[in-house]
Amino acid sequence: MSRPGPSAPRQLTLTEELEKLEQQITLTLQEIDSNFAKAHRIVTTSILPLVEQYGEHSRAVWEATKFWKQFFEASANVSLSGYEELVDGGETSPAEETAHDQEEEQTTAIHDHTQEPSQYTPRPQTSAGGHDTTTLSSVDDQSSVLYDRSRAAQQQPAQLQHHDDSSVLTDRDGDLAGSTPHAPPRGIKIEQQQQPQPAGDEMDIDMDEEDSELIFQQHTTRLLGETSRYYDDDHGFEQGEEEEDEEEEEEEEEEEEGGGGGEVGDDSVLGARSRSKNPVLHRMQNKTYRIMATPHKGISAVKPNTTSNRGVSPVRWKIQPTTPKIKQEDTEKKRPLWEDSPSSSPEPAPPQLRSAAFMSPMRLAYGGPKTSEKLQAAAKAIAAPRTPGVSVQTPAVGRKTKDVFGGVGMQSATKAIVDAKAAAKEKRKSILEEITWESDEDLGVSPPKTIQFAVPASRLMQTPAREASRRIVDDLLLTAGGGDLIEGSSEYSPSVVKMNQDIMDESF
């Protein structure tokens, strides 16, 4: 019996396709739910506890950070506000949101009222004196505007203090529909600055602005005239200070009297405001330090042969100040009588730096084209004081040690140096010839030498900077193999205690 062949798959109907799609959607939603539950379980059981634990651990760090933040703010006199408020209260409450929305509505309402004053028909407000301050008509009659200028000028400070009485947006009886509550204190400035001005006052404001521009131009031209007058004057800035200050004060008084004449109204108030905002240029000359580029000479001294000296900077010309020559007779006449007495002490010589202060006499004694000059410099350096604590560059005010070459001339000092070197060299050679290995063996073992640790101060070396630097250079030359260049210097390294040149002397 033969098996039937596979039949062709029949096409699904629309109902079956819809059911299949619904099953797939249901399975997908179930998978999404299971995944969401799994993620929620992971977040709540693993992540959130770790975050809370991290917050608890970092609380102390945040407290310390706030302390240092306040400390640096107080030390630098700076306030860094904003971050701490966001951290402490990051979520705004609904009440705060509504308050913020109300503030925005108030500012927009004030702006709309200043731009289009015809949309509102407020009832007339009465001030403390019982007079109408402002009366605005409806859309049909915008031209009839009554504005008490003198009252407004006098009651302007009262409006700042009692803003509730004179506010256009005030609606105590509920006459205005869609009115907003009072604006915060920061809205007062906006309303007062953008208060609707009547049509008649626009020309006055324009005139005041033109007057302020004219005053500014007058100040500028007067400044330019004053500076040119200063440069025209041959004596520079030294003459006419008091007269110019008096003229400036008189001009200020005349301007104040001219601006304050007439009735007291908005023109005078606005003119005073515009004048106060302008830079006070006419007071700048009072604080100018009049220092000439060339002292004790005017500008005319720059080019005496030319006719005009205006605009010439004295710095661009080379001026060589010449001091008047004083004759010897004049100095003798000006000298007081007590200086001529023989008992007066001579004037101390000015301090002079020793040219050979840092020259080593041992290095300068060998070779070179100017050997004699070097020897003289070395003799000067040796003649310097060797007291510790006394600087080499300062003059010898009071010498504590005996100056060996004080009364000897330069040639005798040089001769003494050469003789001392030759004697030291001969003595060293004789000592080295006497010491031999045979004599050391004959004497046997040398007895132990007792070292005295309490060294008296007289045995300590007195090494100023010059001698110490010379010893360091000699040691470096010995290490580098330049022992031939150093003759007459000590063969032993320097130590704290003075060394005996006589090696055979066993005394400490």
Swiss-Prot record:
One Pfam family per UniProt: DASH_Ask1
Bias-annotated ranges (Acidic residues): 201-213, 239-258
Domain of life the protein comes from: Eukaryota
BP term (GO), one: attachment of mitotic spindle microtubules to kinetochore
A Gene Ontology term for the protein's cellular component: kinetochore
Cell inner membrane is among the record's keywords: no
Keyword vocabulary terms for this entry: Cell cycle, Cell division, Centromere, Chromosome, Chromosome partition, Cytoplasm, Cytoskeleton, Kinetochore, Microtubule, Mitosis, Nucleus
Intracellular or extracellular location(s): Chromosome, Centromere, Kinetochore; Cytoplasm, Cytoskeleton, Spindle; Nucleus
Region listing for Disordered, in residue ranges: 86-138, 150-355
Start-end of Basic and acidic residues biased regions: 161-175, 229-238, 326-338
Main subcellular location: nucleus
Polar residues: compositionally biased ranges: 116-138
Keyword Glycoprotein appears in the UniProt entry: no
Similarity comment text for this entry: Belongs to the DASH complex ASK1 family.
Protein's job: Component of the DASH complex that connects microtubules with kinetochores and couples microtubule depolymerisation to chromosome movement; it is involved in retrieving kinetochores to the spindle poles before their re-orientation on the spindle in early mitosis and allows microtubule depolymerization to pull chromosomes apart and resist detachment during anaphase.
PANTHER family documented for this protein: DASH COMPLEX SUBUNIT ASK1
Subunit and partners: Component of the DASH complex consisting of ASK1, DAD1, DAD2, DAD3, DAD4, DAM1, DUO1, HSK3, SPC19 and SPC34, with a stoichiometry of one copy of each subunit per complex. Multiple DASH complexes oligomerize to form a ring that encircles spindle microtubules and organizes the rod-like NDC80 complexes of the outer kinetochore. On cytoplasmic microtubules, DASH complexes appear to form patches instead of rings.
Designated name of the protein: DASH complex subunit ASK1
Source organism of the structure: Chaetomium thermophilum (strain DSM 1495 / CBS 144.50 / IMI 039719) (Thermochaetoides thermophila)
